């Protein structure tokens, strides 16, 4: 098991921020999620809210922390213990994407920047297996690591006021899908017809941190057919269990 050099710092009167090395890395993400599970089990009788990101955990207690150093000492001990954590059940989700011009509104610009054809960009984007590193800034927005280096491109200096629901986009070293219509500054290359956040479901977002996402290309006709199934409430996204 990898142990990293962590930093622990107070974050307001009721929270502690735990930080790993500042980089996007699957081994760090795995360690973050492992420690999160340990803390959730340790505090099962205490109402503690734990938020995870790429390389950090924010631990929010239900009371003011009286002695921050005692709390941090406990956290350090728990982290270093070889705790028995059940293997997490992770899944790979197969997500359909239509890259037609009607959806991929930034593809023309990216072909010039990358010196690649549209078909080459689509192939590079759809052949990678992505890891869900973080879910935010909108509910159901999956920040995905694993984008081919040839497709890395900065976000727009001036964000669009309106990005369509399902827009598949590139921002820096990552790719992601806008779960709902919203402002956004990522570069849009396609659209997925499925729901990434559905409040009518017991679990609104089908994916969790650590899961994998594989995109596959569909035609506009296939896109419309899938969208009709989604709207009818009968579409089932394909997935498979992978090692956690």
Can you name each region flagged by the protein language model?
Residues 1-244:
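Glycine-rich active-site loops that engage anionic ligands at enzyme catalytic sites
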